[in-house]
Amino acid sequence: MEWCLLRTPRLMLVLVLWACGLTAPARAEEAARKFYAEDIKAAMMAHIAARADADGVFHLRDEKTGEELALKFVTIHDPVRVIDRNTYFACTDFAVVGAPEKLYDLDFWMNPQTGELKIYDEKIHKEPRKSLLYGWYKHPRYTFVKDRVVELY
């Protein structure tokens, strides 16, 4: 009986260490996974496809004006970026449905979740404005200082 009591804490310790050892490689593998430009772009395309309606229209509410925007994806800007080991970034252009000369520049932030990149934030970086001299251009709402958003107005 004494022998069993002495062995029980050791047995429990061994079982706990064994159980931790089974899950540790999975956590380490996820933390160690590196994502590259093609991974960031693939995550972006999957997000856009999931958010777009049957006609490929990406709907977004403008948080400054309250306007419901109907946009068509145009391109992902190069380069996409790794901000830190858990934050990835892509900048895109979307055209207003029915007015392809009016472009919105949308920014997307993503992080790794369950082994893949998922978008956790999106913002309108630049909005279409018209100049008598230059026509339509993208007017910035914010800029970046050391990878942080700084509002311009």
Residue positions per predicted region:
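Bacterial N-terminal signal peptides
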Residues: 9-22
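N-terminal secretory signal peptides
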Residues: 29-85
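Sec/Tat signal peptide C-region and signal peptidase I cleavage site
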Residues: 23-28
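A short, surface-exposed beta-strand/turn
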Residues: 100-125
